[in-house]
């Protein structure tokens, strides 16, 4: 704090990640035939980042505040485990005869499990670096009742990078090539809070985020992929509208908010 006009801040963040996903995909062709594919995935790891920021009051007797901040990428070290099981029920070849010498027309059940084939999970250890974040904000208060805020944030998602456990990117050429489909994202946040009485406030906000994907982006799965779940949507801009109320007492506080989201 310099003369109550310039404020500097620094934060070191530590993150723990524990993510699990199970997917079941099934096709039924009628007559008893069909197949299903099950996948199990798990990611564990930890990461860290550093945030630097400053708030400036350019005019001594004005409530105007200008904020700047820079967030380093989050540097993750992650362990990825996955396995899959494929089951199918199909009619046996009619040219195959059964034990009494007549053509077999029974449905046969077949299954393969990567855990059994590989004697364990498929395991990958890697490092992930997220984008840098740049932030500019403005704040202003009108009297003792109204507070206004505006914020702009930018992240370039095409700078995301995967590396192997030794820190080399060569073994992750496929994963890193997917970042060519990503682009910089701008986020704008606007907000207002009005205190009806000192303990009770009304709030409203708007949030706009441009698309993370390029217009011609698509999910490029390798031919040997075992992932079948739908987890990709090439959406364009995203808008959030919020309304809220808040109560602050000496022994109790409560907040309630409503959010409406639209995207293209």
Where on the chain are the PLM-derived regions?
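Outer-membrane beta-barrel porins/channels
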Residues: 1-264
